[in-house]
Design a protein with these regions (language model features):
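Ligand-binding cleft/hinge of the Venus flytrap
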Residues: 31, 45, 49-72
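A ligand-binding cleft/hinge motif common to bilobed small-molecule-binding domains
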Residues: 81-111
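N-terminal segment of the mature folded domain
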Residues: 1-23
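Ligand-binding clefts/hinges and TM-proximal coupling segments of bilobed small-molecule sensing domains
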Residues: 43-55, 139-168
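Periplasmic-binding protein-like
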Residues: 14, 102-134, 155-160
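Flexible hinge/capping segments at coil-to-helix
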Residues: 19-40
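A mid-sequence, solvent-exposed acidic-amphipathic segment
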Residues: 62-88
């Protein structure tokens, strides 16, 4: 509050369920996580994926106590994908990009996330920030990020909010 800000769009990525190849348990939604034959591997408190899981469960009216494996925590997308691949869990949540690294799982889309950078106006106008934004907006940089796979770089570097009159 009281601080002039600029929000710069960076990229989007897809989040979804990691399930065993062929989705043998036919997991389609968060509602399925309350089934007694489904076990999830969760992410650590404070992670973006954990926030997503908790919010989706809340929206569905599913108490965390009703989700088998909710207390079983891993610390990365790859650990979650590997747990599903090994059969230690039926489902996990993570980014599409990381699912591509584990051939024994399938990815089921849940939502797209937007990654944005918030910059104070006083910093936005400084030369180092302007140079960083120039790099972010360059086709070379965007091609490199897109080449990593799993990221949508459309509108990268675009100002999506400004309460200070700053222009793209």
């Amino acid at each position: 509050p009281g601080t002039d800000l600029v929000v710069l769009h960076l990229l989007k990525r897809k989040q979804g369920f990691y399930v065993q190849k062929g989705n043998p348990k036919n997991i389609q939604s968060f509602e399925d996580l309350k089934r007694s034959d489904i076990t999830i591997v969760n992410r650590e408190p404070g992670s973006g994926v954990r926030v997503l899981i908790d919010e989706k469960l809340r929206q569905a009216g599913i108490p965390t106590q009703e989700v088998n494996g909710y207390q079983k925590v891993v610390n990365s997308h790859l650990e979650a994908a590997a747990a599903v691949n090994r059969g230690d869990a039926d489902v996990a949540v993570g980014s599409e990009k990381h699912s591509l690294s584990v051939p024994g799982i399938d990815f089921l889309f849940i939502q797209e996330e937007s990654y944005d950078m918030v910059i104070r106006k006083e910093d936005f106008l400084k030369k180092p920030y302007q140079k960083m934004i120039e790099i972010i907006r360059s086709s070379e940089y965007q091609k490199e990020v897109a080449g990593l796979g799993g990221y949508n770089v459309e509108n990268m570097g675009k100002i999506i909010y400004s309460d200070c009159g700053c222009r793209p």
